[in-house]
Amino acid sequence: MGRYTDSVCRQCRREGEKLFLKGDRCYSEKCSVSRRAYPPGAHGQGRRQKPSEYGIQLREKQKTRRIYGIQEKQFRNYFRKADRKQGITGDNLLVLLERRLDNVVYRLGFASSRKEARQLVNHGHFFINGHKANIPSMLVRVGDIIEVRQSSRESNKFQEMKEQAAYKTPPEWLSVDAEKMTGTVLAYPRREQIDTLVNEQLIVELYSR
């Protein structure tokens, strides 16, 4: 299955809540969820049936996939990896998703959305520990130093991000030096440090069927 290419605003409306897929627009009056708080399509404003238990679990999985921009096969692989680890499977899953390079770039404030972060990583704008890193799904490790490529730092895009990053506070497991355009992974995130509004237990129940 290819990557979803339709309007990201439609994805938020389908879930009935903001997934913050479009950066600053999600915080503005232009947000589609604020203006049209009903699902997309001809029957979007019609009466909605009460979802089944399976339907609720499926929606939660789809929502999480959309938030992190991950395809089904890759998401299932993350779940299997999380299930093999010690600890709580749902927590392990979210930690793996948070460790993705595109997510870390977003969390550091070097991109306005995960989608933009993925594009910037793909285009080779970032280094990890001095080596070029252009794979969005790469999992960062404790101690990794992420930096904007030297030749990219003077671009208008990154100068703007530099100014914005100076006013943003990264999660506790990351540190950022906005002036030098670098960030460091201090630790792996704990569940309480992840502000993504998902119920991961529903995903565990879905895949455990």
Curated annotation (Swiss-Prot):
Transmembrane segments: none
Keywords: Ribonucleoprotein, Ribosomal protein, RNA-binding, rRNA-binding
The keyword rRNA-binding belongs to this UniProt entry's keyword annotation: yes
PROSITE patterns in the cross-refs: RIBOSOMAL_S4, S4
Any one GO BP annotation for this protein: translation
Gene Ontology CC: small ribosomal subunit
Superkingdom to which the source organism belongs: Bacteria
Residue span(s) of domain S4 RNA-binding: 99-162
Cysteine pairs bridged by disulfides in the record: none
Pfam family, one: S4
InterPro entries reported for this sequence: Ribosomal_uS4, Ribosomal_uS4_bac-type, Ribosomal_uS4_CS, Ribosomal_uS4_N, S4_RNA-bd, S4_RNA-bd_sf
GO MF: rRNA binding; structural constituent of ribosome
Function, as annotated: One of the primary rRNA binding proteins, it binds directly to 16S rRNA where it nucleates assembly of the body of the 30S subunit. With S5 and S12 plays an important role in translational accuracy.
Family that this chain belongs to: Belongs to the universal ribosomal protein uS4 family.
Subunit structure: Part of the 30S ribosomal subunit. Contacts protein S5. The interaction surface between S4 and S5 is involved in control of translational fidelity.
Name by which UniProt lists this protein: Small ribosomal subunit protein uS4
Natural source organism: Syntrophomonas wolfei subsp. wolfei (strain DSM 2245B / Goettingen)
Name of encoding gene: rpsD
